[in-house]
Amino acid sequence: MKGVGTDSKAGNMSPKNLLGTTIGDMLRCATDFRSKVIGIALKDRASILPAGHSANAAYWYDKSVAGVITSSYYMEKLPDWVKKFNREAGMKKGYDPKSGADGVTLTFNMAEAALKNEQLGKGETPDMLCISISSTDAISHKTGTWLSPGKENEEVFLTLDRDMKKFLEALDAQVGKGNYLLFLTADHGGSHNPNTLKEHKLPGGGCDMGAKMRDLNEKLKAEFGLDIK
């Protein structure tokens, strides 16, 4: 397994650890593998896992090349339209867009490019485009769900609303109103930053998982003689 579009380990990814099948896999089976299933996200797992084992492609972002990449699990080289997208995206190497509103826009722009260039929804069998917005997850982990002093959280969600509207308009134009099924879901929510809660005299706290793991390992070592590294 190797990266396509990058030489970094960010490309060494596949769904091999996914134990079950996905709705995308079942769609491919039901149409004798004529349907196209494509996953798009900034994070590798957010693109790969929803698309499933038999996906035609999964694309994610690698900051070391400032562009969208994939792996040899799916293809040997990036399609020309992906290369063009990367050239025109204007991202800087080393910058991670996940924690900002530009990550939302980048994801939806990539999804729209896939929609048009892969001619999704234009064939005789239904296609599936899995889009995961990684920025809402990253900003909630970084600042919590409370409005941060710099309003990064607010900006991300306002951008999500605007960009989703634009993408729905692209679906209407490309596939046609009433000709596609759209569903929204999430793997988890966010929570308020415990330090912010304390500032406002609200109950809350954090959990030092590193300390808990060290304590657990010490107890296992004492009880069973296990030296866990």
Go through each PLM region and give its residues.
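Generic, well-ordered alpha-helical scaffold segments in large soluble proteins
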Residues: 26, 30, 110-118, 132, ...
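Active-site His/acidic residue clusters
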Residues: 48-57, 122-160, 198
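Secreted, luminal/periplasmic, and some membrane-associated catalytic domains
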Residues: 1-12, 53, 77-79, 85-87, ...
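Phosphate/oxyanion-binding active-site loops and adjacent basic polyanion-contact surfaces
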Residues: 15-20, 96-112, 122, 149, ...
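Active-site regions of oxyanion-processing enzymes, predominantly non-cytosolic
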Residues: 29-30, 34-41, 47-50, 104-138
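Short glycine/proline-rich turn/loop motifs
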Residues: 3-7, 93-96, 139-146
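Long, well-ordered early-domain segments
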Residues: 1-91
